[in-house]
Regions:
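Vicinal oxygen chelate
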Residues: 2-3, 6-15, 43-47, 66-143, ...
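A short, acidic/glycine-rich surface segment
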Residues: 40, 61-66, 132-134
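Short, charged/polar surface micro-motifs in flexible loops or helix N-caps
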Residues: 49-53, 59-62, 84-87
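Core segments of cupin and vicinal oxygen chelate
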Residues: 13-52
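N-terminal beta-strand motif that seeds the catalytic metal site of vicinal oxygen chelate
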Residues: 1-19, 75-80, 128-143
Length: 143
């Protein structure tokens, strides 16, 4: 028996809701959607097709597991499909966000990984005109 119909939401924890809002709304351009009046702070974003991202305050958070200087695809993350990965990568570069930007050999898709202020990883994935690895730009500490 299949226990579910579809993915409903992805939830991540942050230590500062205002910084998360600045990143997800201001930098990435996510659209905030109504959130029930829970007894803890947070933000909800609509991602399309009924999927949402739930940002939850956990100010006692030790640090997420992805707190590392480098950005690697095998670290925990969620991925968002983009119809034009080249335009998305250009926009991320213009914003000056540290990222890992590669073309996957097995799939031929371009993958651009960024981190939010709490170290949670977000991947943008989609088709590209390039067939080779594009570039890797990471934080100045690892450049």
């Amino acid at each position: 028996m299949k226990m579910f119909k579809e993915l409903n939401h992805v939830s991540i924890t942050v230590t500062d809701v205002a910084k998360a809002r600045e990143f997800y709304t201001g930098v990435l351009g996510f659209e905030e959607i109504p959130r029930p009046a829970f007894n803890f702070p947070g933000i909800w974003y609509g991602l399309g097709n009924g999927l949402s991202l739930h940002i939850i305050l956990n100010d006692e958070l030790v640090r997420p597991a992805v707190e590392r200087e480098t950005i690697l695809a095998r670290y925990g993350h969620f991925a968002l499909w983009t119809e034009d990965a080249d335009a998305t990568a250009k926009h991320i570069e213009e914003l000056g966000l540290p990222c890992r930007d590669v073309v996957s050999g097995p799939t031929g898709l371009r993958q651009i990984f960024v981190k939010d202020p709490d170290g949670n990883m977000v991947e943008f994935i989609g088709p590209t005109a390039s067939k080779e690895a594009v570039r890797r730009m990471e934080s100045p500490a690892t450049a």
